[in-house]
Amino acid sequence: QDHICTNVHVQTKERISYDGHDKLPRSLLHGLQWLLYGSGPAAAVIVEGGGFFHGDDKTRPDLQIHVAPATVVRGGQTQIPGFGFTINSTFLRPRSRGSVRLRSSSPVDEPLVDPNYLDDPHDRKMAIKSVRIIREVLSQPSISPLIAEERLPGPSAETDDEIMAYIRQYGCCDYHPVGTCKMGVDDLAVVDPELRVRGIENLRVIDSSIMPVLT
């Protein structure tokens, strides 16, 4: 399993974001400011805020958002001009499960990794709901006066199908993979509750691959 990240990108009326600050000469000045004083944009993280929401589970939050004061499309893989900020959302407990399979009998061949994002209908429902919640946040009077327009998915994406088409094109990995080496006591468990690999002495696995599911 892994979290898939859905984003809403907006253009601001004024240049109040980090967009363009990664280019010379600004990036050089920011680097010097950090090196000499330990301050400035280079001393900050790209995610400046966040929060949790109840999407479907009323007992505990199941959606998480992050606010980045820059236009970060597909984890930075896609560049669009202008300036603004990004709010991304993640459904915390996805039901879709992927797979990791051997490509061949050769240990040097990379494995076949299929995260199988959005395979479960509930995951698709929550991804769409997260975009609608972000839009609701952006419509609040404390923030809406700063916004010139929604750039992605854009005002034309209104129906569930239109929003899902955007998510499938622009959704990105949240880098939280788990479950390829699960911990447990059943026959399919790779490690026991002490993180010891079953059937092999003096070998433990201690990274997030031991988590059976995302929680």
What are these regions (language model features)?
Residues 144-155:
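Short, glycine/acidic-rich hinge or "gate" loops at secondary-structure transitions
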Residues 121, 154-157:
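Charge-dense, low-complexity intrinsically disordered segments
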Residues 1-16, 56, 85-145, 164-215:
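C-terminal structured subdomain/cap of oxidoreductase catalytic cores
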Residues 1-81, 136-142, 158-161, 165-169, ...:
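Mid-to-C-terminal "cap/lid" subdomains and adjacent gly/pro-rich loops that border
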